[in-house]
Amino acid sequence: MGVPERPTLLLLLSLLLIPLGLPVLCAPPRLICDSRVLERYILEAKEAENVTMGCAEGPRLSENITVPDTKVNFYAWKRMEVEEQAIEVWQGLSLLSEAILQAQALLANSSQPPETLQLHIDKAISGLRSLTSLLRVLGAQKELMSPPDTTPPAPLRTLTVDTFCKLFRVYANFLRGKLKLYTGEVCRRGDR
């Protein structure tokens, strides 16, 4: 007789270690398939959006930042191969990570950055790193390595934002939209 498994305890431990940037070696490879994991990151993104929305005009960025377009054509998305979806999600996540890091640099250069804003930027950076790690375990990064005889993926649609509120809105919408659709499909198929 072995020790009874405690998936809830494992999930809680994993959620505590992931934001620290520590590899979670004992985590199940399909941790992202647990809806509570993704919902936690979505909630953090929405909280950041709400905090920045609470300001009169919201803190402005000193320059425009390019972010992925979060609009989803559900008909086209369902017709895409999972590999194409993975490429779009991976590219979007990479661009979003760059955008948040750029916002962090702009915030650091401003005089007296709001402490709560800095906290949400730091949480977003940690969350994106964790999501990137979880997607690697899921195998999403492998989809970027396409054979030389295939056509290159369509360029990622982008837009620019000029406030922290808009940046966090894109972050939340990307997680709720493309990332959730992709992980849901992969987890349903059980391919990874």
UniProtKB/Swiss-Prot annotation:
Signal peptide: 1-26
Pfam families: EPO_TPO
Single Gene Ontology MF annotation: protein kinase activator activity
GO cellular component, one term: cell body
Localization: Secreted
Glycan attachment residues as annotated in the record: 50, 64, 109
Gene Ontology BP terms: acute-phase response; angiogenesis; apoptotic process; cardiac muscle tissue morphogenesis; cell surface receptor signaling pathway via STAT; cellular hyperosmotic response; embryo implantation; erythrocyte differentiation
Disulfide links within the chain: 33-187
Tree of life domain: Eukaryota
Family: Belongs to the EPO/TPO family.
Keywords: Disulfide bond, Erythrocyte maturation, Glycoprotein, Hormone, Secreted, Signal
InterPro entries reported for this sequence: 4_helix_cytokine-like_core (IPR009079), EPO/TPO_CS (IPR019767), EPO_TPO (IPR001323), Erythroptn (IPR003013)
Function text: Hormone involved in the regulation of erythrocyte proliferation and differentiation and the maintenance of a physiological level of circulating erythrocyte mass. Binds to EPOR leading to EPOR dimerization and JAK2 activation thereby activating specific downstream effectors, including STAT1 and STAT3.
Tissue-specific expression: Produced by kidney or liver of adult mammals and by liver of fetal or neonatal mammals.
Protein name according to UniProt: Erythropoietin
